[in-house]
Amino acid sequence: MSDKQQFIRNFSIIAHIDHGKSTLADRLLEIGQVTNDRTKKDQILDSMDIERERGITIKANNATFDYLAEDGNTYIMNLLDTPGHVDFTYEVSRSLKACEGVLLIVDASQGVEAQTLANLYLAMEQDLEILPVMNKIDLPAADVEKTKIQIEESLGLDPQKAVAISAKTGLNVKEVLEQITKQIPSPKGNSNAPLKALVYDSYFDPYMGVVIKIRIFDGRIKKGDRILMMSTGKDFTVNEVGINRINLTPKESLETGEVGYIIAGIKKVSDAKTGDTVTLFSNPTKESVPGYKEAKPMVFAGLFPINGEQFDELVDAIEKLKLNDAALVFEKESSIALGFGFRVGYLGLLHMEIVQERLEREFNLDLITTAPSVKYIIRSKNGEVEEIDNPSRFPEPITIESTEEPYVKATVITPNEYVGNIMSLAMDKRGIQLDTVYLTQDKVQLTYEIPLAELIFEFYDKLKSFTRGYASLDYEPSGYKASQLVKMDILVNGEPVDALSMIVHRSKAEQRGREIIEKLKDLIPRHQFMIPLQAAVGGKILARESISALRKNVTAKCYGGDITRKKKLLEKQKEGKKRMKQIGNVEIPQEAFLAVLKTS
C-alpha cells in the first residue's frame, strides 16, 4: 500500500429519507473548506432544483476534501452522497460499492425507520465498516439513550461507537470526521497492478460529453491513456482526469483507492454503463469488479404529450434524460385516445413523478401519464408464456390458462397505536402477514407479502394518512404468484378508451370500475346528448353511470304562442341529437385521465 493510500477515506452517508443526510454532508464540506460563504448553499450535493425543493436526494453525488486530523495527518476524504428513498436503492448500492465504510444516520427524535434497516443491510452485504451517527439531538423530542438502545437491539451495532450530533447547528460534527479516520479503513489495492476501476455513476454534459465517475481499485489512470470498457469492449482515449471538489478539478492522474472522474470524448452514457469496469486497452485487468446488479424497472406507464405536435420534442427530451438516468427504460407506443407517446419503465412511483416533472420542467413539455401497471406473466392454453406490462396486450380471456403477478416483501415500522390501521390497510390490499416484531415498547415492525400492483396504487399515501405520517415503508421483490387477473375496459359513449384500460384483480374490478366511472362523471363536461359511462370486464358491465344531456333552448326564438312551431323545433333538435350521438365524439379532458391515477 502506498503512503498516500493509507490516508484516503472513502465513505458514504446512508439514512432514511428526512433524517438529515444532506445537511450533515453540508457541514462536513464546510469543515473541509470545500464551500465558503460565496459558494455556500443548503444541500450542496443535491444538484437538481427538484432535489432541493422536495428535500430529497435522487442522483448519487460525491465530493473530495482534505481534513487535518488530531493525529497531525491530513486525510483525503471522499464523500459519496446517496439517495434515501426506496425507489433509488440502486443508486445507493452502486455508491456503496466505491466505499470502505458508511455513516448510518439515525434521527434521535424518530428512531430507527424502515429505510435505515434496508440501507444497513445493503452496507452489510458489501462488508463495509458501519459508523452510527445520532442526528438532531438539538430537538426537544430527541432521546439519545433510547436511540442507543435501538441501535444495539434493532441494528445490532455497538452503541458505544455512535456519535451524537446536530447537523443543523454543527454540534459535534468534527467528531464524526475524527471517527471516520479511526474506524473506517483505508482502501486496499495494488498500485502496480493493471488498471481496474469501477464506474459508479456517469452523466452527460453538453460541452464535455459523458463524464464518468470512477473509483480506482488497482493501478492508475492519467490523461492520454487508452481505456477499455469491459462490458461493451469499446475503447476511448482519456482527455482529462480529476477529482470533484464540488466543481470538477483536473489533476495529473488518479491512483489506487482514489475516487474521481474521467472525460474521454464518449457521446452516449450507454457506452459508460454504471457498474462497468474500466481498464487499460494495452494492459487489461483479468477480471472485472464483481457483484453489480442492473436496475430493473418495477412500474410501467404510458407517457404522452398533451399537444400531439410536441411528440418529436418528447423523443428528444426522453433520450437526453436517459443520458443521466440509467434506470429509465422506454419504447414508443400509440394510443387511439392520446396519439403517439412512450411506454416507460420506472423504479417506482416517486421515480415516475420525478421523470415527468423533470421532462416538463427542463424541456418545457406538457405531459400526461396513464395509470401505472406492473409486469404480469400470462400463461396461454397453447403453452406460450408472455410477460406484459400494457393492458392493450392482454390476451382474450378464452385463451388464458393462468395469470401471475409480482409480489413484494414490504416492511412497515410504526408506532404501536397504529398497528390496527395498518393491518386493515394491508388486508384491503390483499396482503399476507409474515411477521410482527416489537423493536421497542412502542415501535413495531410488521412484514407483509403484498402484490406490487396494490403497493403502487396509493398504498404509501394511505399508510402515511392512517399513521399521521409516523410509519415508514421499505420493500423488495419476492417473486411471482398465481392470481386471478382481468382486463377492465372503460367505455365512454359505448367506445372503449384505450388509455383508461387497466389490468386488475378480479375481486377488485367492480370497486375500481365504480370509482373511476364516478370520477369521470364529474369530470367529463355535459354534451348535447346523453353519455353512458361503463366499466366492463369481457362483455360484462360491472358499473354504469350517465352524463345527462345539455339542453339547448331551441324555442327561445319563438315569440308568443304557436305551440306547433315549438314542437317542430323540438322534434328537429331530437333528430339532430340522434345524428350527433352516432358520430358524436366525446371530449374527455386531461383531468379525467389523471383522475384514474388517484381514485380514492
From Swiss-Prot:
Q: Which family does it belong to?
A: Belongs to the TRAFAC class translation factor GTPase superfamily. Classic translation factor GTPase family. LepA subfamily.
Sorted alphabetically, which CDD domains does this protein's record hold? EF4_II, EF4_III, LepA, lepA_C
Instruction: Record the organism.
Output: Leptospira interrogans serogroup Icterohaemorrhagiae serovar Lai (strain 56601)
Protein name, as recorded: Elongation factor 4
- InterPro entries this protein is in? EF-4 (IPR006297), EFG_III/V (IPR035647), EFG_V-like (IPR000640), EFTu-like_2 (IPR004161), G_TR_CS (IPR031157), LepA_C_sf (IPR038363), LepA_CTD (IPR013842), LepA_IV (IPR035654)
- Describe its membrane topology: Peripheral membrane protein
A Pfam family the protein falls into? EFG_C
What role does this protein play?
Required for accurate and efficient protein synthesis under certain stress conditions. May act as a fidelity factor of the translation reaction, by catalyzing a one-codon backward translocation of tRNAs on improperly translocated ribosomes. Back-translocation proceeds from a post-translocation (POST) complex to a pre-translocation (PRE) complex, thus giving elongation factor G a second chance to translocate the tRNAs correctly. Binds to ribosomes in a GTP-dependent manner.
Task: Say if the entry is tagged with keyword Methyltransferase.
Answer: no
EC number(s) for this protein?
3.6.5.n1
Indicate where this protein resides in the cell: Cell inner membrane
